[in-house]
Amino acid sequence: MKIPKERRTYCPNCRKHTVHEVLESKRRKASELKWGQRQFRRVTAGYRGYPRPLPSGNKPVKKLDLRLKCKECGKSHIKKKSFRAGRVEYVA
């Protein structure tokens, strides 16, 4: 998949549309303290089994997190929607 190296998008720090540099970052492990994970631990505690059908098979590729770094202020933020991509190529 081809992704442009720079894009003009909204910067929450500057509060306006500016040119951003597109960087790739690895997805971090999901937080164990989120409500869903706490609920899951509560449901599976004790002698109870798994509450839903077991997920079968592995996903073919990992999800990609794009980090956008503002050229004006230098702050970076993550693009909200992440997606799966096998090969990523950054195009000028």
UniProtKB/Swiss-Prot annotation:
Coiled coil: none annotated. GO terms for molecular function: large ribosomal subunit rRNA binding; structural constituent of ribosome; zinc ion binding. The keyword Ligase does not apply. GO terms for cellular component: ribonucleoprotein complex; ribosome. Gene3D superfamilies: 3.10.450.80. Disulfide bonds: none annotated. Its cofactor is Zn(2+). GO terms for biological process: translation. It comes from the Archaea. Keywords: Metal-binding, Ribonucleoprotein, Ribosomal protein, RNA-binding, rRNA-binding, Zinc, Zinc-finger. SUPFAM superfamilies: Zn-binding ribosomal proteins. Binds 1 zinc ion per subunit. A zinc finger (C4-type) spans 11-73. Zn(2+) binds at residues 11, 14, 70, 73. Part of the 50S ribosomal subunit. NCBIfam families: PRK05767.1 (NF004425). Binds to the 23S rRNA. Belongs to the eukaryotic ribosomal protein eL42 family. This is Large ribosomal subunit protein eL42. The lineage of its organism: Archaea, Methanobacteriati, Methanobacteriota, Methanomada group, Methanobacteria.
